[in-house]
Amino acid sequence: MQSAGLSYDEVFAEADALGYLEADPNLDVGGIDAGHKLAILSSIAYGVQVDFDAVKLEGIGQISIDDINHAADMGYRIKLLGVSQMTENGLEQRMTPCLVPETSPLGQLEGGTNMVVVEGDKVGQIVLRGAGAGEGPTASAVMSDVLDLARGIRIPTLSLIHI
């Protein structure tokens, strides 16, 4: 929105045309879809039960163009970030808009590109970046899971998800 100088409605229409939005756009705008993905990634990372309801959600629906412009004036961009960490109180998960430096790897993300940053005591930061929205990436991910199941490859998260 910021880099293209488009209104929210124009960006929304473009994202819809590109196949980036869920059938119910509130799943995206409300951070719900991303929160579900965070819960699944957290279960893999920490070996815990997937608990979608434990993710604290705040979407991007309330972000205005003024908010975006003020952030830019300070050298930041507003990005929807999911953060998962194990604390002394247990697993904490949140999906919320955050200010990130516009020159940072997260600040440079555009369009349907996603990024996962994993931090470890011994390895520091590991960054995974790639296509994360649209028909192609979604179909690829689903087919990969289907093929793993067909091959009998155990998917650890399936035992942690109770529907």
Give residue ranges: language-model regions:
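Substrate-binding/catalytic subdomain of NAD(P)-dependent oxidoreductase enzymes
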Residues: 2, 9-108, 113-115
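C-terminal catalytic subdomain
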Residues: 117-159
